[in-house]
Each structure stands twice: as structure tokens, then as C-alpha cells.
Amino acid sequence: MKISGIFNVLLAVAVGVLAVNLYNRESAENKGGQTAIENIMTRTSIRSYTDKAVDAATLETLLRAGMAAPTAKNQQPWDFMVVRDRALLQSLADSLPYAKMTAGAPLAIVVCGNLQKSLPRVSASSWIMDTSAATENILLAAHSLGLGAVWTGVHPYPERIKAVRTVLGIPSHIVPLCVIPVGYPAETPAPKDKWKPENVHYNSWGVHTEQ
């Protein structure tokens, strides 16, 4: 085979490999985007769980997801309490009006704001935004891993904050935002369609269609 022929063959192979790589990369990117959106749209609150345990590696993934949340000035004003003890889970369920399902969960994650980490020059309440973002990350991560979870509110209710602090021995500079029971779903409720165009305003209040 002439040198020019060999060169043409090699060039054709190289172009083919490049095309395949680009296609695979584009497919992966599209799949990733679709997976993220699908995960958001199909997540729903799960309040009933099987007896299957959540292993340590899966738990760490949830906590890493929480800590990957956006945070003002990178304060990271959060702490996370993991509760597996059955007596403590029962006590949380007994103490909080909307967290009864915690008694049947393999574990709960208590998302807390740390007032000593929250910088007053940013905002005395910026921890609320940061820990809320962390909570949503945990909920989405749980759903993506085949787990079920639900956000049960603690802050800003003084009696609930006091109850959680008492059960878990939490100091006064730590404010529990919420308790997230986590486990493998024993129910499959359909996600609610919450899309309402009337809640969107374009350029001026009350304009619900983009011109």
C-alpha cells in the first residue's frame, strides 16, 4: 500500500474515533441533564419506610450532597446530626407534630444552623438560606439513590427547637432547622405537578406571558 493510502486510512480511523468520542460525550452530557431534571421533577415526600438499613457509604453521600450546597461567603454555617438510635428516633417522633414517621425510619438527619459559623456581617439569618439549600440537596440525593425522605420543619417554632435540643443534647448556639427521616420507600406516591404559570411574572408584576 502506498504511503498516501496508509495516511488516508489512518486519517479516516482518527476521524471516526473522534466522532464517536464526541457523540459519547454529548450523549453523556444530555443524559446527565435529563437525569438531573427528572430527579427534581419526580422527587416527592416519602413518609413510610422499609426495614432495610441505609449503609454508611450511602449516608456519607447524602451528607456530602448537603455540604455541596451554596453558602454565603462560603460560611458553611451548618452541622448535621445523624440519628440511628431507635429510642431517639421515637423521641423525635413523639416531640414533633409532623415528624411521626421518624419512628419508623432507619435514620434521620437533623440539619442545623451553627450561629458561631454564621457571620453577622453577611446576615444574622443567612444560615437559614444555606441550611435550606443543604436540605434540598439531601432530599434530591436521597431520591436519586432510591431512598425516600421528607422535610419536617423545626425552625422557626420555639417549642420544636426546644424539643429537638432536649432530645439530642444540642447546645444553644445550634439551631435545628429540620429533621429529615430517611429510608427505603415503602410507598410510591405520585409527585404533584406544581407548575403554575400565574406564579411567573415577566419584567413587570402581573405580566404572566413573555412578550
What is the role of each PLM region?
Residues 2-211:
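Acidic, surface-exposed loops and disordered segments
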